[in-house]
Amino acid sequence: MREIIKKLEERIDLDNQIMTDAVNQIMSGEVEDPMIEDFLIKLNAKGITENEISSAAQVMRSKSLSIDLGNGAHVDTCGTGGTGLNIFNCSTAASFVAAAGGAQITKHGNKGVSSKSGSADLLMIAGANINHDRNHLKEILNEVGFIFLFAPLHHQAMKFVMPARQRIGKKTIFNLLGPHTNPCNAKRQILGVYDKGLLKTFGNVSNLLKMHHVLVVHGNDGLDEISITDKTFVTELKDGNLNQFEIQPEDFGLSRANITALEAETPEESLELINAAFEGKESPVQDMISLNAGASLYLSSASNSIKEGVSLAKELLNNGKAKQTFSSYIEMTNSL
């Protein structure tokens, strides 16, 4: 490890084998905390490459408690978080709408770190049990079309890096890995990023990880979602090809809104906004859910375009099917 850190001090990028060896040692508990800290700080200082991210993600995947779902069209909606903006749990709400429309959603997530309400916080406040084993998760997915993959249960080797990360107190490569380490090995994903500079990077990393269809998104307002308040920058990976473009609410017949209409200070407030949208109340919250659910429906091939997906999402929100999917998930997680 000392030799690897010396390379970082000399600003030498790590090749796949060296990066794999380094992260494997760290996530096997073979490296002392001060050296992990040194490695992470010096990797940051050098600048993290796409190859380094993909190599580390592959190690993290290999260490996870995985669930084999074959090569189905299931979609992850896990993004980076880290925006510092406290809005309702859009990606979680959108996941249930997409599931109601026939998509299979394997959402990877955690409790809030930079936000006050992470996906796990919301689901627990709603009454869901998120601590299921792999067999039960398969059963829930087959029945409801949605499962939540609580990161601490599936990535137990992360305990070896937590002390060093906490001492550093800033983003490290591990803040970039979560969205690339779905325990079900999802090949399709809507992946929100906190920084516009990560759009192409994450598109290329997704390609290195042999993803099939990914939308990497960043709102001009700073959100790691498709935004209702402003244009959204998109990098689409499909069948090995990258395409970059912009979309805006008007493209889908929706009006722009102020970000204050999306704000939620607590998981309870977030749930209140989502429940109102699921009851059919038209609002910027409902529009934003529709935008992001539409993207997941497109990724899952349940619709032929994001626009078609947004129309279907609106229908599912207003006819009660999204609400029913949400209720069914909560009920089933408590009955197993």
Region annotations inferred by a language model:
Residues 1-2, 19, 36, 53, ...:
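A general structural signal for well-ordered alpha-helical segments in protein cores
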Residues 7, 62-65, 87, 102, ...:
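Glycine-rich anion-binding loops and their surrounding alpha/beta cores
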Residues 8-54, 62-70, 288-289:
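N-terminal glycine-rich anion-binding loops that anchor highly charged ligand groups
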Residues 15, 32, 49, 104, ...:
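Helix N-cap / loop-to-helix initiation motif
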Residues 40, 88-144:
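A glycine-rich phosphate/pyrophosphate-binding beta-strand-loop-alpha-helix module
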Residues 41-45, 96-100, 295-301:
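Short glycine/serine- and small hydrophobic-enriched flexible loop segments
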Residues 47-113:
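Active-site cofactor/substrate anionic-group-binding motifs, chiefly glycine-
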